[in-house]
Amino acid sequence: MLYFDQPVQVGFSYDTLSNVTRDLVSGRVTSLNDTTPVPEQNSTLLTGTFPSRDPNNTAFGSVNGAVASWHFLQSWFQEFPHYLPNDTRISLAAQSYGGRYGPAMMSFWEEQNQRIENDTWDGGEGEQFILHLDTLMIVSGCIDRYVQYPYYPQQAFRENGFGIEAVNETIYNGMVESIPECLERIQNCRDTAAISDPDNLGINATVNEVCEDAETWCRTNIVNPYTSNSGRDYYDLSTVSPPPFPAGFHQGFLNREWVQAELGVPLNWTGSSPQASNAYRDIGDYPRDSWLQDLGFLLDNGIKVSLIYGDLDFACPWAGGDAVAKAINWTGSAGYASAQYAEIHTNDSYVGGLVRQHGNLSYIRTYQAGHSIPSYQPETAYKIFTRALFNLDIATGTQSTAASVNAYTSTGRAQPDVQLEPTDTGLSYCYTYAASSCYDWQVDMIQNGTAEICNWLFVDKNTTQLFPDTIAKCRADWAAGSGHGNGTGNHSVPKPLLPFEGSAVGGKRGYVESGVERGVDGWRKCDDGLKLRNG
């Protein structure tokens, strides 16, 4: 399995490196030049290494990102052939915004395959490698705004599979009443793009503005009433905000020095890039057309498509995903329309959701899952993943779906409207690497130095109950003066080990807080750049 950080400037991908500070509460990132003193760090102000953060040095939109990804794969699989699967099949899984860049990528890769095979590709030497494409899996994908926007109001009010009223009826009615104008604006975006930017490259300023304005209007009037009034999590409507789940521990893990060293990366990991996000949004990438057509193209060329949704997600509602699957125009459309919703038998005793499947297309409603489906339902997600890859029916994993004639068609319920009771998501806790998980009063305590922080966890009754061994070790270390954690008060004694790790660039000399790990109290001069360590 390969984890592909794209477009450039997200995750561990970078163009050029720059030294920065990052405020965990505000999200503000500030560049440090060669003469800027390295500031003292605390539980919310961290230093590290990021990409350039130049918005001109990333891909502009899903189509341009797809082109860049193809060039990368041409190099990757030829320079590192041992990473190619034994059967040479390549599949792609993408989540959330991946509902757009997943289809854009996979369809472009297949188009390039066909150009190479019929000798119409006039690219450079060494870019003739055929990518044998197998499956596109989209998890909680926002794929087509025109199709999916009408399903946000019902996800917010009663018709979400749980009877949850996240907003009141007045707000719900306002959301519903906004749908016609929203769709009109999206259609205007698409009509304008069809004339002046049909390939969705973001090359026409008027198209960019019309499409961005359409998305802004729709979001303001259909999505924001939920986020502003419900008090519930955007990615799990059963949970009040801030959400206790899923954990953001990967953020701390991927920024540990030993992890970075093992991966051979010279910078800090970041979950998202404002520059990359803005580059996509500024051209109005969200409401543009073609992603449905891309899915139909893939299906007609024998490539499997699985659309997987969590029924507690508000970001990309599951009923909208169901509508997308029905709206795909492909040679199997009539067969898919005749399919029914079958129970997904995760194991002998648990039903993990519903699936509608015909041939190579499947749509899944995953029970009791928010936006990050594998975190909520790991076994069900794993079974869906493996069954899709190995040409087995999603419902049971016992029937082959590989036949091109008399394709498999699921049977079961006529509608996916099973009503459930939401399960308890557990105790909430504040993880300072993800400030959105913290209540305002916790943030205030962190900022004024009165909080007790252990491995980026805000220490309170909940975290002591949830992570007793971790908290106990931190407190023992503090008592012994070993500093494994962030201590209490103003964090002056013992000196905290820095939570945001990485290395600076260009041989910059700086001062860093070393902590007692090296037996030094205070600051240590570094000749090889800024080295931030964490116990």
Indicate residue ranges for each PLM-predicted region.
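Gly/Ala-rich beta-loop-alpha elbow adjacent to hydrolase catalytic centers
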Residues: 5, 94, 98, 102
